[in-house]
Amino acid sequence: MFRNSDFDIFEDKTLNGRMEKIRTIIDPKFEEFASIALPILNTNGQEWYAHVAKHLRRTTYAPDNTWVAFAPNKRGYKMLPHFELGIWEDNVYFYLAVEENMKPDQTNVITQKLREVSPLVRELPDSYRLSQDHMVNKTYSLLQYDDSIERYESVKHSEVLIGVEIKRGDKLWDGDGIVDTLVLAMKNLLPIYEKIK
């Protein structure tokens, strides 16, 4: 499914060129992963949907990353906790995402739920990472989880994303290791999702 060569799409700096590569190389892989992920997600009694990023508002600059989001809502995902599989120029990531679009209406409710799952987050493998913005390629140790919740509560453009990132060149790119790792991450994050949904 995914290959180390997928990162080469980011070498094309033009909007049209990169978008064509995203549509022809990456989006089909997102759809293929969705065919694996959706049956697993649908076992919880909810119907889940895959939302592949279209980048329709882009008119000048090529996107620095692209993604597919999984949510139990056919019309959208940003206003709900959801899962997100994406690719940057140097890594593929899979996150349980609570994005800024839930603010301000749901801030108090979701931050309380995020605090309640802190023990579950601490049980995740040490290799799991935390991001505070799905549009910035920077991650943190899970030890900063509580700080990230406080930041989410007080900073307008902040998010809480928990999951895995697989760096370009990682040995997992050989064989099926990457898909297995992404599916395992989803299964490990599902109990947390169930508590914050």
UniProtKB/Swiss-Prot annotation:
Disulfide bonds: none
Any Pfam family the entry gives: DUF1054
InterPro entries membership: UPF0637, UPF0637_domain_sf
Family, as annotated: Belongs to the UPF0637 family.
Protein name in UniProt: UPF0637 protein LEUM_0496
